[in-house]
């Protein structure tokens, strides 16, 4: 590296020293030496000698070199990577400090760097990213124990990447059959996705943990380790952990990937449920807040058959079941606002995203809907409309083995933990109540009380499922045998019963903040007024979203018909002058309008968008399909209205008031649905 700049700085420092006096000037920090770049082999058709290959002794000759085709079986024939005829050949490779990438022989003499799309890959940038991942997973997360007195195969060998000349998506991180070093198999499309690479290398590290446990005689074989030991038909812990590891590297995707919605729709299920194995990565954030950034890797290093991930976690940190159950509740309460150190700032903008459904049981009581009945380690979050200073009470009655739900099993094992959480208008102030426990010993009853904090803008009730024994969940792809622990609740504020069937609103990707609304039913008109704070709105894809829910039962009573049975021809938009808008410009029934309330298409200067669902959900074409119980918290009891703003028009939206005028045709009569949106 050129050092002329340092000579000049040194002369200036000397001049200052002679002018000012004897005060010693600090020496500049020496820059670390730049490691020499590894020799890059030019693609060639000739055979090579080991001396032609940089770090030849760091490349383990694993079972991949006993294959004649990409997805073929391991054979008894060794296809020497020194020979150009082999599937993988050192003449078609590139190395960095801890990785080597081979591209298969279908690339011929063309570097992936020079190949046209879809076979193109910048191998230098790819290896740089791999090295960045390696450094974080080793030095910070401590998945591999180097220079600690323990042995690791990574002391001797490099990770290997095998790039397939293929357009079919391929991304597989793990290892070959010999249990020595982790590998990654990818096609160019997958290799160009930073999050995918971080996720799959996470699997490679999980495999490496297993290999090193065997090397250090802490496991007898790989089937004893968390990498191979299944809970039923698979192990959710693989995917949960790989997702969390990936979002350590690409934190901007923590809340924007579709797996976030998967978790929000399934948080009532067991932590280890297969339906959310790609989305259930938030407990990991709780672990590292409690025990440090290496907490997750510590669990992986101690997770051995027959313990599942939770049992291993409890064992690693010497937790009793009561202590663990207290953590489950604390974790659930924090999920309401995503109050975890690494993600809390952005998380508050997604507050309340976890969905809940209730069924009116009469006399102010609401039963949890079977589609949201909690399982062990699962939880529910219930948004409440209350004011600061009110005395809030939750009366709770557990209903183990109640009809209409999956069987709970032994009712003596029943347990729930209850409480409240609030978020301030500043989206940073969180307050938590004390928790209350209901078990078979209390006849499954419990009461939680709280004075709503003066700074509370949004409030949720928390119901965490905390049985008195730990219940393992087996991956069997059969939700019918999942053990439900149903309950019913009644809420009062200053002694007045809260109506959970009243409208609810949200603006932060399915939940708590960013919008407020009111509504009235009068004559033949449903009037809704919505206030949206564009500064608090959340981007979801290309849109900034808000929503509100209207209770179907009350709308049905007003219309005299079941609105859920009306088809799209029963709805149409109306211009300000009362004329009919001839067709929908968005999902049916839905409308794009410009800043002047004129209907338009999404690409014609669009600023605003609205569509709505009555007890159903939309497929990608916009058609109404049967409600399946898990669409953003709405369904048989709610009609959801979603409003979007094109992000390019947010500035134009501020200060504007737009009115969406709609007609509903029901049993031969016309009703008006007028929704006024105020953006500020």
Predicted regions and their residues:
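C-terminal motif of bacterial Sec signal peptides marking the signal peptidase cleavage site
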Residues: 18-21
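Zinc-dependent metallopeptidase catalytic helix centered on the HExxH motif
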Residues: 179-254, 258-261
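Acidic/polar, low-complexity intrinsically disordered N-terminal segments immediately downstream
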Residues: 25-77, 81-83, 510-564
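A short beta-strand micro-motif common to beta-rich folds, especially ectodomain repeats
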Residues: 543, 654-666
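Active-site-proximal alpha-helical
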Residues: 262-329, 333-337
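Beta/coil-rich, acidic/histidine-enriched accessory regions frequently appended to metallopeptidases
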Residues: 307-520, 524
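Zn2+-dependent metallopeptidase catalytic core
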Residues: 42-181, 188-201, 205-215, 413-419, ...
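Solvent-exposed, low-complexity, repeat-rich "mucin-like" stalks and linkers
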Residues: 381-384, 512-613, 670
């Amino acid at each position: 590296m050129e050092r002329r700049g340092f000579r000049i700085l040194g002369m200036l420092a000397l001049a200052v020293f002679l002018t000012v006096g004897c005060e010693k000037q600090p020496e500049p920090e020496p820059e670390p030496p730049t490691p020499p770049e590894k020799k890059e082999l030019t693609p060639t058709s000739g055979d090579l000698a080991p001396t032609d290959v940089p770090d030849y002794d760091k490349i383990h000759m694993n079972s991949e070199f006993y294959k004649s085709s990409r997805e073929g079986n391991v054979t008894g024939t060794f296809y020497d990577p020194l020979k150009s005829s082999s599937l993988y050949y050192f003449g078609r490779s590139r190395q960095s400090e801890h990785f080597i990438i081979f591209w298969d022989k279908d690339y011929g003499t063309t570097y992936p760097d020079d190949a046209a799309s879809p076979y193109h890959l910048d191998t230098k940038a790819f290896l740089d990213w791999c090295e960045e991942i390696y450094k974080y997973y080793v030095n910070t997360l401590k998945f591999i124990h180097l220079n600690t007195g323990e042995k690791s195969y990574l002391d001797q060998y490099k990770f290997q990447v095998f790039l397939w000349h293929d357009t079919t998506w391929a991304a597989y991180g793990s290892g070959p059959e010999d249990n020595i070093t982790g590998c990654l198999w990818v096609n160019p499309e997958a290799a160009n996705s930073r999050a995918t690479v971080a996720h799959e290398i996470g699997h490679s590290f999980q495999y490496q943990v297993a290999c090193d446990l065997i090397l250090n005689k802490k496991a007898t074989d790989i089937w004893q380790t968390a990498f191979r030991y299944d809970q039923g038909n698979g192990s959710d812990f693989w995917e949960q952990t790989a997702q969390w590891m990936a979002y350590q590297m690409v934190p901007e995707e923590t809340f924007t990937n579709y797996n976030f919605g998967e978790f929000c729709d399934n948080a009532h299920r067991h932590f280890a449920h297969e339906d959310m194995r790609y989305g259930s990565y938030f407990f990991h954030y709780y672990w590292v807040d409690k025990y440090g950034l290496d907490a997750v890797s510590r669990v992986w290093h101690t997770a051995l058959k027959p313990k599942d991930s939770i049992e291993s976690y409890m064992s690693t940190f010497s937790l009793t079941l009561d202590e663990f159950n207290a953590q489950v509740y604390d974790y659930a309460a924090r999920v309401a606002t995503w109050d975890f150190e690494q993600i809390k700032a952005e998380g508050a903008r997604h507050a309340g995203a976890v969905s809940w459904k209730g069924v009116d049981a009469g006399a102010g009581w609401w039963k949890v809907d079977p589609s949201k009945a909690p399982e062990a380690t699962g939880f529910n979050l219930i948004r409440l409309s209350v004011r600061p200073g009110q005395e809030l009470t939750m009366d709770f009655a557990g209903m183990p083995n109640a009809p209409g739900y999956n069987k709970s099993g032994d009712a003596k094992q029943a347990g729930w933990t209850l409480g409240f959480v609030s978020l301030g208008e500043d989206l940073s102030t969180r307050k938590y109540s004390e928790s209350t426990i209901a078990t078979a010993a209390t006849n499954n009853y419990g009461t939680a009380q709280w004075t709503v904090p003066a700074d509370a803008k949004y409030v949720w009730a928390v119901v965490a499922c905390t049985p008195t024994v730990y219940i393992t969940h087996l991956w069997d792809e059969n939700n019918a045998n999942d053990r439900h622990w149903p309950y019913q609740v009644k809420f009062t504020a200053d002694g007045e019963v809260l109506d959970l069937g009243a409208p609810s609103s949200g603006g932060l990707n399915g939940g708590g903040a960013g919008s407020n609304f009111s509504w009235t039913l009068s004559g033949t008109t449903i009037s809704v007024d919505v206030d949206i704070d564009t500064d608090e709105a959340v981007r979801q894809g290309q849109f900034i979203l808000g929503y509100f829910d209207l209770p179907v039962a009350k709308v049905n009573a007003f219309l005299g018909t079941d609105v859920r049975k009306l088809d799209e021809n029963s709805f149409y938009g109306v211009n300000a002058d009362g004329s009919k808008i001839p067709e929908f410009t968005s999902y049916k029934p839905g409308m794009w309008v410009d800043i002047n309330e004129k209907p338009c298409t999404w690409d014609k200067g669009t600023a605003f968008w609205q569509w709505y669902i009555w007890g159903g959900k939309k497929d990608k074409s916009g058609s109404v399909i049967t409600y399946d119980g898990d669409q953003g918290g709405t369904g048989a009891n709610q009609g959801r209205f979603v409003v979007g703003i094109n992000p390019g028009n947010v500035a134009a939206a501020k200060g504007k008031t737009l009115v969406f005028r709609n007609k509903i045709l029901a049993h031969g009569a016309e009703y008006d649905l007028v929704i006024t949106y105020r953006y500020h």
